[in-house]
Amino acid sequence: MNKVYITGSGLWVPPDLITNDELVASYNEYARRSNERNAAAIASGEVAVVPESSSEFIEKASGIKQRYVVDKTGVLDPDRMCPVIPPRPNEQISLMAEMAVGAAREALNNAGRKAEEVDLVIVACSSFQRPYPAIAVEVQFALGCGGYGYDMNVACSSATFGIEQAANAVRSGSARCALVISPELPSGHLEWRDRDCHFIFGDIATAVVVEASPSGQQKSAWEILGSKAATVFSNNIRNNSGFLDRCDPVSRDNRDKLFMQEGRKVFKEVCPMAADHISSHLAANGFAASDVNRFWLHQANLTMNHLIAKRILGREATPQEAPVILDKFANTASAGSIIAFHQHNTDLAFGSIGVICSFGAGYSIGSHILKRV
């Protein structure tokens, strides 16, 4: 079987940062206004009180301290509570493509590759700003890549699933050098007025170069020793927004048209699924958990990651074994594990073993066993 490598990674970070304190101040002002406006209905029991939030609650519940977004003015406006993202003319690059290009250029630079050497572009992320034309084809055009491109969505597992498809294409010979890019824009589909989830997400874009052989100019290279993907249907993480919304104006703006989850159920079900997935993947490739130098896990919840790592290792993981970027970037959907990899892979010695794993809606879980070469 032909060898395949991840030879570069890149990150695009939005311009605006929102701290928990900023977010809470805006949300609590919204809650105050809503409760004041609905005082009579609340008193009669017709409407529920909108509860206040706090920075302490957010950090305890998630481990998140801040997040980056493409626009904070709209998010922090109590009368709006969503980002201001004006439409662009078709002749101008789309926002998601622009994000993707930024991450891709850094990944190519770190891999020692030029855009024209790329013959496959996969844009893999949890949501898209339009059905067609594919964002990947727009990115391919903007960068000047050859070959072909396509979009794919497996929610928070999109990046790891995309890497597997890129690796398969390289192994089969249908591509020599692939870009897997995850421009995540969850600020656009998050209900910022919901206390249970208003703090969860941040915007970001990541990219990795997957190819048949390193250029020799790369900053680090990791051989993909094995990949594993799994899906099990669940409604516990769901977003019902889609092109059919216009067909039923009555339900067009319902709460379920944005991100929704049954958080406790997700926690209870996904933690053992992810841990067992990684453990069985390692065993199938002849590795014990103790052979792994680093786990780059999906960054959704700090307690969740601690429990998954403990179930795999049989003990608490050290910060070096399972690095956390969640506190700085929040949940960035499919990009989280790739941010962790991007920021925490070059310090490991040659021959080190690492695991990238992401999991999320579907349910879906994707993992890759890597060796530094």
Explain the meaning of each model-derived region.
Residues 1-93, 194-268, 272, 276, ...:
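Condensing-enzyme catalytic core mediating Claisen C-C bond formation in acyl metabolism
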Residues 6, 54-154, 284-305:
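Conserved beta-ketoacyl condensing-enzyme motif
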Residues 6-8, 58, 107, 121, ...:
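Buried hydrophobic positions in well-ordered alpha/beta secondary-structure cores of metabolic enzymes
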Residues 7, 124, 153, 178-184, ...:
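Short beta-strand segments
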Residues 17-18, 132-135, 163-164, 189-195, ...:
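Short acidic, glycine/serine/threonine-rich loops at helix termini
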Residues 101, 108, 127-129, 141-148, ...:
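Claisen-condensing/thiolase-fold acyl-transfer catalytic domains that form or cleave C-C bonds
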Residues 174-205:
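Flexible, glycine-rich active-site loops centered on histidine and acidic residues
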Residues 182-183, 190, 232-240, 301-304:
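Acyl-CoA/ACP chain-elongation machinery
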